[in-house]
Amino acid sequence: MKEDILRQIGTIARALDSIANIEFKEMQLNRGQYLYLVRIKENPGIISDHLAGILNVDRTTTARSIKKLEDNGLIERKNDQRNKKIKHLFVTKKGDELAEKIEKENTYSNELVLTGLNEKKRQELAKLLQQVEDNASENWHFVKNGGKREY
């Protein structure tokens, strides 16, 4: 039996992303922007290039999302003290309150999808998925930087 694990992972990711996009729309968040807001909260002062790397998305997409979050008053940019071209990202009070709601939704969704798995299985799954994520991220960076995969 050939298992298509990537298809399963994709189905899970799309379902949860779709739910989040529906629920977060009323909070002034467009598609996927909740990811950016939470990562900025987790990494105060992060720069956009590093944020793009964490999320495995291109810089242009990141810049658009940052602009929308800033326009909605959820984040702010602050100049670097040594290099004015570098902008550090921080959540505002409004953004922090919204990020708290997003984190609650994330905890709820985690519990929901892990229903029926005991703690040992949850830890095993987390370890396996971390390896899959690391492999995917490594390949993403390789291809993004001009590498050619041989399949």
Predicted region positions:
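Short, locally clustered residues in the helix-turn-helix/winged-helix DNA-binding domain
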Residues: 10, 38-42, 103, 130
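Charged, amphipathic alpha-helical coiled-coil/dimerization segments
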Residues: 67-130
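Residues within helix-turn-helix
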Residues: 48-49, 60, 67, 87
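C-terminal regulatory/oligomerization modules of transcriptional regulators
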Residues: 120-151
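N-terminal leader segment of winged-helix/HTH proteins
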Residues: 1-27, 74, 143, 150-151
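Pre-recognition alpha-helix immediately N-terminal to the DNA-recognition helix
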Residues: 15, 19, 35-38, 97, ...
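Short capping segments at the starts of secondary-structure elements
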Residues: 43-47
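Key DNA-contact positions within bacterial/archaeal DNA-binding proteins
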Residues: 32-34, 60
